[in-house]
């Protein structure tokens, strides 16, 4: 389910910059699938349509749920130049949604930066109050608990939901679907068709 997105990127000469905010024990596959779509968009067009960076709350390296460490480009505060922010969560997301994270996410939202949740990153957005009035989705294992904890949210049992400037997906390969729709809304369906043929 998607509403239109207008970042005016088709007319811009600079790349659309996506910052991935990693939470501890993030799901590596969901993150790498999302980045893979952006990389393929650049490769197929031979242009730098998208750039991306990886940040953590405090700028320190993090270990994924698979036990692999990812190089971090900076802290959440360093992500001011992002056009889009995507929060990547994992199995233990509730442990990591403290005041510093919610305050940081609210600052991002106040700058009118579109923001999304990959896998359980949706939970972090909900805790910060950034999904109030929006449709959203989350990993299927977390659907019931999210509905119970946030009964006012409109939570869909969908692979992904794009509602205005909020983007959420259920994790795993659904981050591919989310990012394909994001790319389609910015750079068109023809490019997405070409990207899809590579996966």
PLM feature segments, named:
Residues 131-162, 194-195, 199:
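A conserved active-site-flanking secondary-structure segment within enzyme catalytic domains
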